């Protein structure tokens, strides 16, 4: 039996997750949305949230904006404690590793994120903390790209 996943306690996020699941991963056409499942750092339970993402090569980038609040979101604290996550983009769900973006990449990735969703700059302007950026690398993405292209059907 699959382990139970608890959706975000924020009603608007839980509603967004529900729409994401119901539409097969396309709740807001024209917007890059993904579902991120982390393991609760205290509870050990699986926790799921919906986030806007940008792509950087074969990686996804998300902002731990918490809508400009002065504290990091719980999902960010969870992945710092345990970087093994599940990411769902569209109908495809797969294991991944998630980690805070290194300082050397931050400026470039921040520009990518505010191009994707300009309101992130407004969020940054309303808080005293630096909004963390998170890189999500699907498991096997690098090996698949280097070794051979994905194909459909039998090998």
Where are these regions (language model features)?
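Extreme N-terminal tail/first-helix region
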Residues: 1-32, 142, 146-149, 155
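N-terminal short leaders/motifs
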Residues: 1-11, 38-40, 84-93
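A generic local structural motif
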Residues: 21-23, 48-49, 121
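Residue-level signal for secondary-structure boundary elements
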Residues: 25-28, 121-125
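Short, solvent-exposed coil/turn segments
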Residues: 29-31, 46, 80, 129
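Short beta-strand segments
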Residues: 31-67
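Short, structured beta-strand-loop surface elements
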Residues: 66-120, 126-132, 138-140
């Amino acid at each position: 039996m699959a382990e139970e996943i608890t959706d975000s306690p924020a009603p608007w996020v839980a509603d967004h997750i529900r729409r994401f699941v119901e539409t097969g991963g396309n709740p807001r056409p024209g917007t890059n949305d993904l579902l991120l499942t982390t393991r609760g750092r205290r509870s050990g339970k699986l926790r799921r949230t919906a986030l806007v993402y940008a792509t950087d090569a074969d990686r996804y980038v998300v902002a731990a904006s918490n809508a400009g609040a002065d504290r990091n979101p719980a999902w960010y604290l969870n992945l710092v404690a345990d970087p093994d996550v599940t990411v769902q983009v569209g109908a495809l769900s797969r294991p991944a590793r998630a980690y805070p973006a290194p300082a050397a990449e931050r400026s470039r990735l921040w520009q990518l994120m505010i191009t994707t969703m300009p309101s992130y700059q407004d969020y940054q302007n309303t808080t005293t903390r630096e909004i963390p950026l998170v890189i999500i690398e699907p498991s096997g993405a690098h090996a698949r790209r280097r070794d051979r292209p994905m194909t459909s059907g039998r090998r």
